[in-house]
């Protein structure tokens, strides 16, 4: 039940082979807990293991949904099996600084701030994910690359401060909210549609349902050196681009597209590049 073992700081291990459900905050604050066996659990509540700073691994292979704040501040957690999970709740892994990689093969939705400040996270596999919540990966400073082949929506500030993020693959995306990639100073490759190569950038043929929020790529210069799908028609149809969406972005396209519907920050061009402009 709720708060069943809350703040039992002397508890070091748990073996519950027949339990199928764990209530909210059941083991929250059990700072001495290092080992836990819950092989039959299918449902886990909110903040269930919050603050279990000694926990290093856990098998939740039968769980389908991870509640809000389940692993907040589990700073020693390095290994977790969530092979059947389809939903990751808000703040689920907030500040799990030791977590370096996680495989979520069935997950379709990542909640708000789900992996915020997971500073050790270098890779994540989300082959079925459709939605990425606001600030889901904010300040994941070690995250280098991520493939999101089915994602259609990316929330506000989803990847803010991911300074090592070098490439991202988003072939199905239709809506990228404000500040989604703000502070991604290492970003070199973005694929939004079609097939791309390193240092490539592809834009879908936009309509009024396609949105790019303000300041998505504005913090640092992003060089798009392999542009193969940038046409006048594609650009002029993209009417939902936010303010400064294309600030600091350069490309080697030789046409003269019009961006009359966009607001672009004034910049100085490097040699051999053309600045995306508003005229």
Model features per residue range: what roles?
Residues 1-6, 23-28, 45-50, 67-72, ...:
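Consensus positions within tandem repeat domains that build extended binding/scaffold surfaces
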Residues 180, 234, 263-266:
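Single-residue recognition of alpha-helix capping/boundary positions
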Residues 212-213, 268:
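Short, aromatic- and cysteine-enriched interfacial helices/patches
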Residues 8-21, 31-43, 53-65, 75-87, ...:
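Structural signature of tandem-repeat unit edges
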């Amino acid at each position: 039940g709720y708060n069943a073992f809350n703040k039992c700081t002397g508890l070091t291990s748990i073996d519950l082979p027949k339990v199928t459900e764990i209530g909210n905050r059941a083991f929250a604050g059990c700072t001495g807990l290092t080992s836990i066996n819950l092989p039959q659990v299918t449902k886990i509540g909110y903040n269930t293991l919050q603050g279990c700073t000694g926990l290093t691994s856990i098998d939740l292979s039968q769980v389908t949904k991870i509640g809000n704040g389940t692993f907040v501040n589990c700073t020693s957690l390095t290994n977790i099996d969530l092979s059947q999970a389809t939903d990751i709740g808000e703040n689920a892994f907030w500040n799990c600084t030791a977590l370096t990689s996680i495989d979520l093969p069935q997950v379709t939705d990542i909640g708000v701030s789900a992996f915020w400040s997971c500073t050790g996270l270098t890779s994540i596999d989300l082959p079925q994910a459709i939605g990425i919540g606001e600030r889901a990966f904010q300040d994941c400073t070690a995250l280098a690359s991520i493939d999101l082949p089915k994602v259609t929506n990316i929330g506000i500030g989803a990847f803010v401060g991911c300074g090592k993020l070098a490439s991202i693959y988003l072939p199905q995306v239709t809506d990228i909210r404000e500040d989604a990639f703000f502070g991604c100073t290492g970003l070199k490759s973005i694929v939004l549609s079609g097939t791309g190569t390193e240092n490539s950038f592809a834009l879908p043929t936009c309509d009024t349902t396609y949105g790019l929020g303000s300041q998505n790529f504005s913090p640092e210069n992003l060089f798009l050196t392999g542009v193969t799908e940038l046409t006048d028609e594609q650009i002029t149809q993209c009417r939902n681009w936010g303010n400064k969406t294309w600030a600091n972005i350069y490309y080697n396209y030789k046409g003269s597209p019009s961006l009359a519907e966009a607001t672009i920050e004034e910049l100085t061009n490097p040699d051999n590049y053309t600045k995306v402009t508003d005229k």
